[in-house]
Structure formats: C-alpha cells, structure tokens
C-alpha cells in the first residue's frame, strides 16, 4: 500500500501498491499500458507485466511530462494523474472506442479476435494521449481505426492492413500538420508511421504497431 496515503478508488482500475523496478504482476501490466506512449524515440514498451529498466524509463518520461517527481516509482502521485487521465471504460480522456471503430459496434470481422482488436485500439489510444500531451494538449483528429475485412475492402485498404488488427490509426490534419503528427509519432511507440510522401498518404498520417519498424513520410523527413 502507500503507507499513510489511502488508495483512491477508480472506475476503471485501482492500484493498491507502489510499483518500482523488479515488481511483476497484472498491476504492472496495467501501468505499462498507460505508459506505452512514453518509450522514447523509436522505442516500444513491452506489456510483459515485468517492471524492468524500460518501464522505469517510460515512467520517468511520464512523470516529467506532467511535472511529477521523476523518480521512476509509481505511487499515489503517479496513480492520481493516471486516474485523472482515464475514463471509467479505461480509455484515455481525449479518445474513445467509438473514434477508433467506425466500422461496427462489436470489433468483429478483422484478422484477430474482437477482444484483441479492442485491446490493441486501447493501447493505441494511450499512445495517442501521450502524443497529444507532447503536442500541447491540442486535439488530434482520428479519421480511421479498426476495420473488419468487409469495411477494409469497402475503402480499398491493403489486404493485410494493420487496421484489420485494431492497432492502426489514421490521423487527419487539424491544429497540427500531417508532417508534425508523423514526426511526433516517432517518440510514442509506433513501429509503423506512413505519411505525406508515401503513396496514398498525402491526406493523412497513418500510425500502427506492426512487428518491426517501417517509417516512411519522405515529405516530412522521415
């Protein structure tokens, strides 16, 4: 527990102990999900339930981003910030499942189970939340997320598009240019970044979590 500070109950998830390097368990994985947007340039944080050096580094970046004591230990101050950043369905406050799935209501029909597609979208939202904060807390426009095979075919998507796995998001221009979005995404755990200069991506920036890095947005210096 947190010593004299009482644990705060939260509608999505409540941590009941301080976490630091060496800890393992489901509560570590819940923390990692929310830190997945803070792996550092080109990094991807493993959601492996094990609090290792990479998790500590991601936590330090999160703490620094929000003006917390950057000690790499998750205690009440860190948890209170996370509680403030999440809604009761565990999505970050500035993104919704509905935004990430304009195809159907149940996440079915893709290349993975509905539960996996929905979870992948959740992780993407936490990455986008980190990216949004880094860009001055201005809105990020989501134009496409999960697609079933039928929805993907209807829009002419690639046959093995990451949208079919629920871990791809297309972003439109808004307060930030498409290039600014593509450039910033390099810091937030996306292995796939496609933007202006890549064929078919002149009107959006695509980010995803493919198995190995592929970044291509030549008009943006990527």
Q: Which residues does each predicted region cover?
A:
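Short acidic, glycine/serine/threonine-rich helix-capping segments at coil-helix boundaries
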Residues: 19-84
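Active-site acidic/histidine clusters and adjacent loop/turn architecture
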Residues: 89-137
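Surface-exposed patches in mature extracellular/periplasmic domains of secreted proteins
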Residues: 42-48, 70-74, 136-146, 190-198
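Active-site-adjacent substructure of cysteine-protease-like catalytic cores
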Residues: 134, 138, 143-164
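Second-shell loop/turn segments in exported
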Residues: 15-23, 44-49, 67-70, 109-122, ...
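Secretory targeting and sorting signals
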Residues: 1-9
